[in-house]
Amino acid sequence: MPKFQGAIFDVDGVLVDSPHQKAWRESLRELMEAGWRDIRDQTTWSPDAFTPHVYQQYVSGKPRMAGALAALDYFHVPDTEKRVAEYAQRKQEMVVRLIEAGDFTAYPDALRFVIATKDAGMRIADASSSKNAGLFLRKIRLDTFAAEHGISSPTLKPGQTLLDYFDVDVSGRDFARGKPDPEIFLTAAHELGVEPGHAMVIEDASSGVQAAKAGGMAALGISRADDADLLAEAGADLVVTSLDDVNRDALTRGELTR
């Protein structure tokens, strides 16, 4: 297997525990309990039905409009075409409020892994379909994290945010096709100057794993929602529950293993 030269990271669920799931769930609840209450009985929605499993399998990793449509279709909401934009906008307004309020955390194992991949000589990119990804990445001071955790890195500069640290940022761009199409990851690899076969993608969603494999890349699945089986079924080369479990010495040989 060729040595990895590039690492491409999804953001929500990989790097940060974001409020996206909360925003999708709660914005739909608000609609169902107010403006859409007249059609509620025609749907399969209930306050407890929008589970983490539903989010991971049907919504996670998709662009905003596609995610909104997937959720409405899942709950059999009628007249989706005229409702999807309202739902997507309501979700966006809520997620921005939550981000500005600091209602998210960065995963320490992910930040350690990001630093380790760059220290190993790889070029790195963030590649999320979310247009909010940059809001998270700008708020995370990677130099502060490293200092607090005793990490010394030759690639880390004072004052660097996580967004600054990435060599390439393709998050939030408008692509013609969303995941599981590989367009976003192929674009990231191209801008990194790395052939797809020399790149690995770190993903928490089945659609993202499928996109990586469709693009000819290695896929590292991170299971944070008890969905390891879904990631494996999607074709992940390795699935872990913590990125600390990945064998970093093996990475330098182009191997994904524990």
Model-predicted regions and their roles:
Residues P2-K3, I8, R97-D126, G134:
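Short, acidic loop-to-helix structural element flanking the phosphoryl-transfer center
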Residues H53-L98, P108, A116:
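A metal-dependent, Asp-based hydrolase signature
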Residues Q21, R25, R29, E33, ...:
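An amphipathic alpha-helix signature
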Residues M1-P52:
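Active-site neighborhood of HAD-like aspartate-dependent phosphohydrolases
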Residues L15-D17, D126, G221:
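Hydrophobic residues in well-ordered beta-strands that form the structural core
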Residues M1-G6, R112-I115, K131-R258:
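Asp-based, Mg2+/Mn2+-dependent phosphohydrolase catalytic module
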Residues M32-Q56, V77-Y87, K91, P158, ...:
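Short, surface-exposed acidic
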